[in-house]
Amino acid sequence: MPSTLYPVRIDRRVFVTMSDGVRLGLTTYLPDASGKGPYPAVIESLPYRKDDDCYTRDWQTYAYLAQRGIAGVRVDIRGTGASGGVINDEYSPQEIADTCEVLAWVAEQEWCSGDLGMWGISWGGFSALQTAMLRPPGLKAIVAAHATHDRFASDVHYVGGSLHAAEQGDWPVSMIALNGLPPDPDIVGEGWFEMWIDRLESTPQWLPRWLRHQSRDDYWLHGSPCADYGAIEAATLLIGGWLDGYVDGLLAMLEHLHCPRRAVIGPWGHHRPATGVPAPTYDHLELMARWFGHHLRGDDNGVMDLPLLTAWIRTAPPYDGDRCHGYWRAEPTWPPADRVIWERSLGRLEHRDSLTWHGPQWVGAHAPAWDRAGVGSRDPHADDANSMVFETLPLPDPLDILGLPEVEL
């Protein structure tokens, strides 16, 4: 890590032509330090527009890295923002192929050392994992936050195999609106109107395709790390939150990936850890700079001395406004070597072999929705009062529950 912070040079009007002639729009964030390069580079590929929707967020991320001698490249996916073409689906083979072409272009630039990383939160995290599965030349490290291992059973489509109805009425509809916005004429120049009309007329709705695939088939296995954990060789930093819908995937990847890896799980929802709700927050940019500094530049910064998993353990009472009570716990292995089977009697032997409870249909409707953590009540007592609940007497000693517990009744 450099001892001084470099000035940053930003260029929002960078374009790279794909092998089929479609032009993608990029923004580069470069260390402005004469004679100090070339630099490693970190790439992020998103459909969320780099020139307006995500500009402030991108600047915060890539200026931080560039000041520390790591170039940043932010890409608008084909058919979004400043990029031409049409986006036909999320995480399509075309999208990942485009990303590999962008990586190759970045590696050839005079300001780049050829040592590449990728990062992202949610879509960008998926993109980093899926690109790493193809092992493109030069890609040595990734950071994937709030991403999952299984596009079918652990994403926003069919959670556990059941249709995720709440997200299907929200997520794909919002993407129709976002994909329908015009490119910025000040960025793409002449031809912006024709790009926009083509986008409006040609971009399909995604939901019908998802509904045609209601079981784990090749459509969902594409881009799912669980289909081949061994395909990812790049050093992988995983970041998640206990109130996020993708934390199960983080734990599965931490256990099954073979590459150098570390993970952090905080109390947040689907947020950037540095501003996550509920607090405490976590400086993910500092950790990212260390991760990429070590794996792309060879910095001896101790990042691989961190425990395999650093996780926030909630304690009672768990929440105080927007703050979560608890402490950080370090695990050198995953699953934990000291895990035990915990046996407690919840009742007595009875002749009945089943229990039935017909509760009101609104149970659970007032709890915070997935991807909306930090909004609404976190007190489960009203739902408990209208549900079938199995509970013990007060425990005699503290008990940490960490990971994916299995309960046998």
What spans do the regions from the language model cover?
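Conserved alpha/beta-hydrolase "acid-adjacent" motif
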Residues: 244-250
